[in-house]
Amino acid sequence: MTEISDILLRTILDSRGNPTVEAEISTISGGFGRACAPSGASTGIYEAKVRPCDEAVADAYINLIPKLIELDSADQRGFDDTLHEVDGTSDLSGIGANIAVALSLANAKAAASTLNMELYQYLGGAFISQTPLPLGNVIGGGAHAVDATDIQEFLIVPTGASTAAEAVFTNALVHKRIKEILIARGKGCGKGDEGGWAPHIADLEAFEIVNEATTKVFDETGIEVRMGLDVAASEMWDAASGRYVYKNAKRTTEEQIAYIADLTEKYNLIYVEDPIQEEDFEGFARITEEVSGRDTLICGDDLFVTNASRLEEGIRNDACNCVLIKPNQIGTLTDTFETISLAHDYGYETVMSHRSGETTDNTIAHLATAFGCCFMKSGVVGGERIAKLNELIRIEEHF
């Protein structure tokens, strides 16, 4: 019933106008799954490797697809094991991580469709009853914008929202209020890759603006909205000098830790992603300890790249208390699930995330719900972002 009967691959556009891979899988009983590979602008050095799309698709039709036809789509681990076997490398550079993630997710969706189940139900089971809160980028800089803030993402999460719909609309309202504040201050209102505003302002002013906007929204709605950051510190790190290079400062690791800890206290940050460069497990452990008296999540993205082996090293070093989950970093749903399971076993929170180069694929809303992630990081506005946010609203209607 769940046997794979047909697989199609194609090259499509992502939100930055770059090519990416889309996969479609059909089963003999009429099940169907479609999924797309996203891409990042600031990528970790340990991420699985992508291949040029047209070349990877052509190779897959010759060397990979024939070995997937007639597999049981309900055997996700078996499907993903076949991807690894054909690939033959440790980083998916053989078939390409973009091919692997599109096929792996499409396979799970095809199996769920065959069984007439929603993907989150198929993966998460009968007792799933809660969606994650949306974590959204409202001011962007770093690798996502030109001549904007040093910190890559100024984030918000509506901790006071009682439903997914309320949370999604609250984040959108903060985004609107930020535009109004920027206009009032005479600042430009361009947007970065993920839909956050990308004004030519310093980090300090960005903090002030987001704080003002969240206060306005609380006064209007009574819903508390907390701030977070994606520092993307690896993008600032200069190994030659041993400094984190900002526009107006160069900080040692000690100074970076003190700076982030001060921001966390001053702005009551609920979430700080990649405050330290991706090779420094000790630095991550020190900042995690520094803020341990607060409810702040110190999240590893480039540090862990959704890789269970990297996470095991983090656990040994007491680095972080949260893991960012990006399926395309590791390439398959099975590997993604294993990293999430390991994180939860050791008390780490997990955050399911989009990439800066996205499509209208909404799969991560289902994964975030099925796997018990506390947040879904997916932007606030833009068609490729709201596709995921609106899916959260739809999913919650089933509870």
Swiss-Prot record:
Its cofactor is Mg(2+). The keyword Methyltransferase does not apply. (2R)-2-phosphoglycerate binds at Q152, K326, R355, S356, K377. Pfam families: Enolase_C (PF00113), Enolase_N (PF03952). Binds a second Mg(2+) ion via substrate during catalysis. Keywords: Cytoplasm, Glycolysis, Lyase, Magnesium, Metal-binding, Secreted. Disulfide bonds: none annotated. One of its GO terms (biological process) is glycolytic process. Its main location: cytoplasm. The keyword GTP-binding does not apply. GO terms for molecular function: magnesium ion binding; phosphopyruvate hydratase activity. It comes from the Archaea. GO terms for cellular component: cell surface; extracellular region; phosphopyruvate hydratase complex. Coiled coil: none annotated. Catalyzes the reversible conversion of 2-phosphoglycerate (2-PG) into phosphoenolpyruvate (PEP). It is essential for the degradation of carbohydrates via glycolysis. NCBIfam families: eno. This is Enolase. The gene is eno.
